Amino acid sequence: MTAVETNYREGLTQRLVNIYRDVDTAIIGAIADRVLARLDGASTPGIGAASLWDESSCLLISYADSITDGRKSPLACLGEFVETHLDDVIDSVHILPFFPSTGDDGFSVMDYRAVDPRLGSWGDLTNMSSSRKIMADVILNHGSRSSVWFRQFVDGEAPGSGYFLSVGDDFDVSHVIRPREHALLQPVTTVSGEKKVWCTFSEDQVDFDFSNPLLLEEFISIILDFIDHGVRILRLDAVGFLWKETGTSCLNLRQTHAIIQLIRYIADIYDDETVIVTETNLPNQENLSYFGNGNEAHWIYNFSLPPLILYSLLFADSSILRRWSMSMPPALMGTSYLNFLSSHDGFGMRPTEGLLDETQRQRLLDRLEANGSLFSRRAKADGTTSVYEANTTLFSALEKSDGDPTGALISARFVAAYALMFGLEGIPAIYFNSLISAQNHTDGVTRSGMKRRINRQKFEKDWLDDKLSDPMSRESIVLETLKKLLTI
């Protein structure tokens, strides 16, 4: 073993022990050796994170099938759209989950090592990665009930038998912070009897058990496979919920941060142009903690920004936004904020905690409801529920304001929102549906019963081409205006 390999092994072992303090050292050592073997030939980190982005960086957020034409794969259509319309302004593309999935529009994954053939292939992703940095979701927290792993869990077969979290009646869940309303623990009949599995986000999405170090080793292998396929930005989805301990909030626990530190360490070794992004839809100070000491996320989402900009523009009151922006610490060298105004999810309300008081928050929710928003709720420890997110497109959210009750200036308000965002420190990210000023897709909600579908409309390429070729269409005007702003 060379001196470099010895150093890597020590680093892996130390970080694994920090997570699994009660696991036999022989097991930890064996995992470190297997991971080290996978890293064989990796070069010493050298490029430096600060060189991976600059003031011109901009991220597009899109589903793999946001655009279809019935001829090419949706992924190929997306790549063609970016090359044709966004070549000079977008350098990175976040392609939302493209794996075989049973729900949540891709976030209930059956197989992390496959691309859903209805969307395209790994080759499509590799082709796109030749000219753009690709962000992919590492959905660490949970997997589909229909996955091979979960069938193994039910049947008592390895490795899946040890991959999912089930708890007994002695596990105290009274302090758990929830993002949803359904029952947290769901009964499942297995070969060894009935078990209660942990389901943070839906009954179809069963949480993994990261107290099993072999599961973490599995995900390390998956992450390295992603990098091999050209993925350079790893989005750790819902990572704050990863580790569970009885009697705690089961959110932002020490082991969760330690796992992120291990992933960062391995990614830096394997490919030093890899960027780690944590998706933690939390109050501001909790979100900031995911920078760690420069050893966790390269980027964190600026989750407080969307609701604060909405409040400013809807009520002609920038005081809260101004105070918040002045209080935000500058990102340290090698890290950055990821600024966004909309995404495939709704507008989170938890990031407004400590920024908007209850009266201000309710005022915002009332206006959003008047503008057509739906709301998703979460269960609280005291048995009540509260709004977790507002489900709406950004364009519809800004439809009518105090100063413009008829909505005549909606497009101007929409562009102003992005002008504000582009002027802030951080990397801007634009959701595909916002890029073309999409309005609330209520038909999608009606057909699916899913409130989030209001902002997840998909588009035919021919329809989109017609709109964007018409210089007088709203879609064309907004797109060209946003592109112009990005070049300033």
Segments (PLM) and residue ranges:
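Active-site and adjacent substrate-binding regions of carbohydrate-active enzymes
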Residues: T2-I488
